[in-house]
Amino acid sequence: DNCDLSILEALQRDGRASLTDIGKGLGLSRFAVKDRIEILFRDRLILGPTVVIDPSRVGFRRTMFFEFKTNPHEPWLAEFLKKMKECDTLNGITGEYSLLGRFRIADEEHFGRILRRIDEVMTKSFFKKYRVVNAINTFKESGVPFERKAAPLTLGDIDLMILRILLNQTRYVKTPQPLSTTQISRLLGDLGVKISQPSVFKRLKRLEDQGVILRHTILVNQEKVGFKTKLVVRIKVNPASYD
């Protein structure tokens, strides 16, 4: 209903919003909001918490879109692309090409390695055809408008591990609540990194202040919410009309 949709929108804007604040705008108690969120999570409308990061701040200086022409009898190709860590989104599309993947690229050497892997696997495909689109600017992503591209930061291994955990919280949580700094500390311990909860808190705060983490949000099953189709629209504009 409308209350559920409003709760989803509130959590997409701020995945750490308090239940009391969400309830105030809906005329619901914090307990009623909590119950609704748990039902949305149980029914897989909420897939789990995550974060939106600025890729350029963590060393991914380029974003590339790859379009692949595939045969319907080649599901193995989509499985291969899903396993590539550089491919953070993959969609089936209509038209001449049937798969669209977004790849995060660190530098030319990294791009070359990705191309070699894709070239190798595409030689085994039926059509052996793909094309690359270079995104020269990112204006908005995951509902977050981007400011001008910021200079990349040199992040340590622990900071990068924290980011990976936050991006993939759906692997770790059994509730719709985002991971606490205590839970992150324990997960890092399982990975062989001994770090206290206060240290995790300080690192997380610094990543937010530096513009690495842009938003805490949730992953939503768009189809269950009612969005049956995703459209990728290409608009040809006059390059002189925007910066």
Language-model segments: residues:
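A compositional/biophysical signature of low hydrophobicity enriched in polar/charged and small residues
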Residues: 1-243
